[in-house]
Amino acid sequence: AYRRIWLSGGMAAAIALLLILWSPWNKSDSTAPDIKIFAALNVPEQVTTQEKNGRIIVSTPPTTIINLTLEDGTHVLLSANSRLEYPKEFTLQNKRIVNLTGEARFEVAKDSLRPFIVSTGDIQTQVLGTVFDVNAYPCNTPTVTLYRGRVQVAKTDSSHRKEISPGQSATLETNGDIVVSKATQTEKEGWTDNEFYFDNTKMMQVLQSLGTWYNISVICHSPNLLQKRIHFRFNRNVSVESLLDALNDLGIAHFQYKNEEIMVY
């Protein structure tokens, strides 16, 4: 069963916090190729639930977060544009396996005899009972962030695992290495509080987050902007136009919504 998280529209203006750390944006480099940061996905317009061969598949549309409770008592907060597949009943004697595309927070019910495994295709996260996030959108680098307990992270095709502690993130790099680093807790927790919260975050990651939340293609016309870092906090329950107006107030770049795409100059 799931419970929709309703986002309060009245909060948007009240909690906006914009910090400006840069001089006005650089002029667009007309010689550099455009970079497509995110391509809109084929996702449902509302929450969908399917049952097939004893497995349940839940998919979320843009700008929607839902709560799920699995058969073993595990609680899942499933983010927008995400898909979770799990068994109706955990019948295996030695493990509990779910499959995730997108982003979710798991609060895993303890079961010392059956580890809980989240598989994203690229990485597997194994736990006994804990609280953690998995971000595995197609456009993003797969990342696991731990809040409580212990988890082990491994590439899907590897037996070598890395264990992370609370306050750490494990990221699968393009070369196949799993890199462990200190997590920015507030930034990682922002989406569960219905906020965009970026703390010294690279523009590339910011644009990926906007694309995945609204399911809108994002194109950067000035690649040198992608390494800029941004401090930004804003409620998620606003139109894309309102959000881009707030980002434009930072003075770091020009954001425009045109032809169902976000353009960045």
Residue ranges and their predicted role:
Residues 14:
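Hydrophobic beta-strand segment of the Class I
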Residues 4, 8-11, 19-265:
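A residue-level detector for the "anchor" residue at the start of short, highly conserved motifs
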